[in-house]
Amino acid sequence: MGRMREVCGACSAMFMIAGILYGTGESFSHEDKTEHYKRIQQLAAEFKAEHDTIICRELLNELSVTSTPEPEKRTEKYYKVRPCVKFVRTAAGLLDRYISENPPQL
């Protein structure tokens, strides 16, 4: 996110949505927090199983990427070589399956 090339934005979104759906806000008990951290680590491990890492610069290692704040021009070529859509699909699929198997108590 923000071209810092740290945790993949798709993974960050997956973790934030899991927090919204399964978190208890400010009233996390120690046990709740432990369970939530397990959930996030499970989702991260499943993403890593498909792509080897959740780190953006490692996911994009075949591309010449920088961490400057100026975005690249969004050209047809940019979208042809950019693998980010694949990572968004993976994260969405993992979260969809997790939600289906573990319906949140809203």
What are these regions (language model features)?
Residues 20-39, 103:
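Phosphate-handling active-site elements
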Residues 1-22:
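Small-residue-enriched, tightly packed secondary-structure blocks
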